[in-house]
């Protein structure tokens, strides 16, 4: 029988989940498990918009969100969207219906800027947006209008009023009484502040901006979990540090191809993500320092070493993966506490044991899969 971690041993406050590289590292999966571990009463988005896809696999089916944070999936927690996040009302309501979320469980800040159909059309017409691997969600165009103070706000739209609430007040109240999760978007390498030139997203996505985007009190932070993908990937163009990339043929041969949610506009087929052959340690060091990482979640370890596929015990991790963990800890100064080893939501090896996963959580996940 595996040891489980007791939420009573996890002090109340804020857990922030951020990605070290260019996204697609499994933030949503890690957020969902930390929400379960800490018995989080709220899961919040604090930056970005409806473009960045967060998802997990359950019984071979893919469960994803674009607008909502994914961390609520295994808990009955409240779902919140802070003023730092752009909201597409159509996607918001579609996800509420799909996940059977009643209006009293979803809260958005009155100051959230709203994505319009014109924002989406503007991005679709942009050759630059196609080149950098944009999801064409309209988030960038919406945020540009926000800077110009011309974007519509949630408080101005009548049908959104049942969902509108002051998110800073709500988040800080919940963090004082228990635990909450703040879920970032994309990754450090795509930060508008710290990424590479024009090959970035429309906002900053680091710990500081997620915190500000929710309006949460920094004194309530208990942990910052930095998600480190064993073999980092990137959508579209832009540098990936001083590390050689796999060719598509090499990825196919090794069975480590990752298909994107972004499709080729001409063929309609999913793009294949670019994949580095290792970690650029200078980038990881910067990501750790700027985000203030207190612990590390290592993801996609099975792409680094197939021998650990679906391993769920720390003692079963291979020397190759354990050596990678040592190097990551040496560079970041933070412990690796969890290793993701496969596609399934529970392909995880916890250093201190596994959070208890009961029939309640399993039934909840199962309810999200269409019959």
Regions found by a protein language model. Give the residues of each.
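Non-transmembrane, aqueous-exposed alpha-helical and coiled segments at domain scale
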Residues: 2-371
